[in-house]
């Protein structure tokens, strides 16, 4: 009985500790390492948009057929470039987002990445 009580108490303590964890801000080299050579799955309007961030600073994205139908003519796929500046992930697509460059502050909590764009727009993603 004491072992069962101990296990229950430890489970509650660990779950409480996990729920108190705060997102860790990704910056500088940690941000670069988290993104470089990885695929980030951006959650947009109920869909996941995979964006591949190559180590050479190039990136590519491809929407699913369903997501592309909602893209209002922006195209199902695009390429661009990415870089880290002032502890933010910056990127510029060839045609998506009208080819404008935007920078994002990223923080990570477990498998979830929270992003806030320079204009205040925010959302979530996961790194695969």
Per-region residue spans from a language model:
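Bacterial N-terminal signal peptides that target proteins for export
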Residues: 1-7
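Bacterial N-terminal signal peptides
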Residues: 7-15
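Lipid interaction determinants
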Residues: 17-79, 88-128
């Amino acid at each position: 009985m004491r072992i069962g009580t101990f296990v229950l108490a430890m489970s509650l303590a660990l779950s409480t500790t996990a729920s108190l964890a705060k997102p860790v801000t990704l910056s500088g080299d940690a941000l670069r390492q988290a993104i470089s050579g990885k695929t980030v799955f951006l959650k947009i309007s109920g869909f996941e948009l995979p964006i591949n961030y190559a180590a050479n600073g190039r990136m590519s994205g491809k929407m699913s057929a369903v997501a592309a139908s909602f893209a209002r003519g922006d195209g199902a796929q695009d390429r661009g470039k990415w870089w880290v500046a002032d502890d933010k992930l910056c990127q510029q697509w060839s045609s998506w987002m009208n080819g404008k460059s935007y920078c994002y502050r990223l923080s990570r909590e477990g498998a979830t990445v929270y992003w806030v764009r320079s204009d205040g727009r925010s959302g979530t993603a996961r790194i695969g």
